[in-house]
Every structure is written in C-alpha cells, then in structure tokens.
C-alpha cells in the first residue's frame, strides 16, 4: 500500500466512531504464515487444513493436543493492567519472524484472541514495518484494520500503551537523540 492510501485509510478510520468491540468468531491470517486466533482455534488447529507447525499459546493454561505433530510453545501471560509484555516482545517477534522465513505456519492465541495474542501480533507487525512509514501511522493502520476484521483487537489499554512506548515513542526518541 502506498503512503497516500495508508494515510487516507487511517484518517478515515480514526475519525469515525469505533464500533463496540465484539468477540471474534474465527481465526485470521495476519501474514503468509502467521495466524491470530483463540483457544478454540488452537484446539481445532490439527483439523484446520492449514498444516500448523507451531502454536504460540499465551493463555495461563498449558495443554497438549493428542495425535498431533504441532509443537506448542507456552508463554503464560495474564490479561490484566499489570502484566509487563515488553519482556516477551523480542522473543516472540524473533520466533514469529523465523516461522515466517522458514514458511512454518504458526497460530498465536490466547483465550479470546483479542488482548494477549493481539499484543504479540501487533509487536510482531510493528517490528517488521517499513522504515518509509511513520510508526504511529502503521500502528493505527494495523489496529483499525484488524479490529475491523475481527470485531475486537488489543482492547487492553495497558497492552496498547506498552506497544506504543516500545515501537513508537522509543523509536522516535532514538531518531531524535540517537
């Protein structure tokens, strides 16, 4: 997408009223090999037809899927205002980049597929953004696009703030003072 289209898209979405959040009902393909979903999507992953190699489980519940070759990586995160996600961003974004590079389909999920998984997906996409696009604009574009498709995305204000601080404010400070 060119800059003009991106700016227009973000401005139109940002100036309209956001619809009330609703629980997403189906898994979403975020990139060629990275998917966003919920707990039910994870349990149904072996029969999804996608051929998942990995599941990144961000719930506090550790589980296995019987008769499946999918590797489940458990990063137990709590969906509240006190959880510090920033210490997980680098590991998760590197892992997802490696899956993308090796063409390994991976499902990122939490219980509802909204906050914890939404934050990790947003961090991953922000880590891969083009240097030509301002970080704040890209953040808004992703946020509105995914929220529009899924009905709810990254609703936890603390998680949004942590992503904004790491990928927008800190990046801006580096450009100004680095």
Curated annotation (Swiss-Prot):
Upregulating conditions: Expressed in the late phase of the viral replicative cycle.
Main location (coarse class): virion
Statement: the UniProt record of this protein carries the keyword Hydrolase: yes
Tyrosine-protein phosphatase domain mapped to chain residues: 23-172
Record's keyword annotation contains Thylakoid: no
GO terms for cellular component: host cell cytoplasm; virion component
Keywords: Host cytoplasm, Host-virus interaction, Hydrolase, Inhibition of host innate immune response by virus, Inhibition of host interferon signaling pathway by virus, Inhibition of host STAT1 by virus, Interferon antiviral system evasion, Late protein, Protein phosphatase, Viral immunoevasion, Virion
Protein's cellular compartments: Virion; Host cytoplasm
GO BP annotations, alphabetical order: symbiont-mediated suppression of host innate immune response; symbiont-mediated suppression of host JAK-STAT cascade via inhibition of STAT1 activity; symbiont-mediated suppression of host type I interferon-mediated signaling pathway
Catalytic residues as annotated in Swiss-Prot or TrEMBL: 110 (phosphocysteine intermediate)
InterPro entries (UniProt xref): Dual-sp_phosphatase_cat-dom, Dual_spec_Phospatases, Prot-tyrosine_phosphatase-like, Tyr_Pase_AS, Tyr_Pase_cat, Tyr_Pase_dom, TYR_PHOSPHATASE_DUAL_dom
Reactions listed under catalytic activity: O-phospho-L-tyrosyl-[protein] + H2O = L-tyrosyl-[protein] + phosphate; O-phospho-L-seryl-[protein] + H2O = L-seryl-[protein] + phosphate
Listed EC numbers: 3.1.3.-, 3.1.3.48
Family: Belongs to the protein-tyrosine phosphatase family. Non-receptor class dual specificity subfamily.
Record's subunit section: Homodimer.
Protein name: Probable dual specificity protein phosphatase H1 homolog
Naturally occurring in which organism (per UniProt): Myxoma virus (strain Lausanne) (MYXV)
């Amino acid at each position: 997408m060119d800059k003009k289209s991106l700016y227009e898209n973000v401005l139109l979405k940002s100036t309209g009223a956001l619809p009330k959040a609703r629980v997403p009902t189906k898994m979403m393909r975020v990139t060629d090999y990275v998917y966003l979903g919920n707990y039910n999507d994870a349990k149904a992953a072996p029969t999804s037809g996608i051929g998942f190699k990995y599941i990144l489980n961000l719930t506090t519940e550790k589980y296995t899927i019987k008769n499946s070759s999918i590797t489940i990586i458990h990063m137990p995160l709590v969906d509240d205002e006190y959880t510090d996600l920033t210490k997980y961003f680098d590991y998760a974004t590197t892992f997802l980049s490696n899956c993308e590079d090796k063409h390994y389909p991976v499902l990122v999920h939490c219980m509802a597929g909204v906050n914890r998984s939404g934050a990790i997906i947003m961090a991953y996409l922000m880590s891969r953004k083009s240097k030509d696009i301002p970080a704040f604009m890209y953040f808004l574009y992703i946020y509105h696009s995914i929220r529009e498709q899924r009905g709810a995305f990254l609703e936890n204000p603390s998680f949004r703030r942590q992503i904004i601080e790491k990928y927008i404010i800190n990046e801006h400070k580096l450009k100004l003072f680095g």
